[in-house]
Amino acid sequence: MKAFLKICMVLIFVGVAHAKNPLTLSKEEEVLQNLQSFSAHFKQVLKNEKPLVYYGVLKAKAPNWALWVYEKPLKKEIYMNDKEVVVYEPNLFQATITPLKDKTDFFTILKQLKKQTDGSFKTTINKTTYRLVFKDGKPFSLEFKDDMNNLVTITFSQAEINPKIPNEIFVFNPKDENIDIVRQ
């Protein structure tokens, strides 16, 4: 009888403990929770009266590093970390360095996303709402409205979850000594 009571107590304890655990994470939630690095080609569409389309490659690494390399229609590189953003425009021989006032780097956005009933993920940071959609278990598109109220849609392809990315690529090193460096 004592053994039976012990078994019942253990089963009740396990049942209560299991009931207190949150629901198991979806595959997408697990990806977001365990994401340490991300690499993908992207297509960025800025929708206004005349839509603008950009193509390039994104490399990002936790906790808050990102490198956006725009290849078309104009070359541009954007380096982000927790302190500043460097926008390098090789055609203009110019790099603009701006202190990062708001935490709106790629990983800050991803870590704050919450799953919605439609399966997408959303978060709002500094009055900007970001919406991420997954496809085949990987981030597929990120939408938001920019500060001029234009809808921006970034579609990812050839996405890699947690690839090895060397830290050095996130540091801006001028390729030409004749460029202007503008600090804002």
From Swiss-Prot:
Gene3D superfamilies associated with the record: Lipoprotein localisation LolA/LolB/LppX
Pfam families in the record: LolA
Record's signal peptide: 1-19
Key words, A-Z: Chaperone, Periplasm, Protein transport, Signal, Transport
Keyword match Cytoplasm: no
GO BP of this protein: lipoprotein transport
Location(s), subcellular: Periplasm
One cellular-component annotation, GO: periplasmic space
Database matches in InterPro entries: LolA/LolB/LppX, OM_lipoprot_carrier_LolA-like, OM_lipoprot_carrier_LolA_Pbac
PANTHER family: OUTER-MEMBRANE LIPOPROTEIN CARRIER PROTEIN
Family per similarity comment: Belongs to the LolA family.
Function field: Participates in the translocation of lipoproteins from the inner membrane to the outer membrane. Only forms a complex with a lipoprotein if the residue after the N-terminal Cys is not an aspartate (The Asp acts as a targeting signal to indicate that the lipoprotein should stay in the inner membrane).
HAMAP family hit by this protein: LolA (MF_00240)
Oligomeric and partner information: Monomer.
Protein name, per record: Outer-membrane lipoprotein carrier protein
Gene, per the UniProt record: lolA
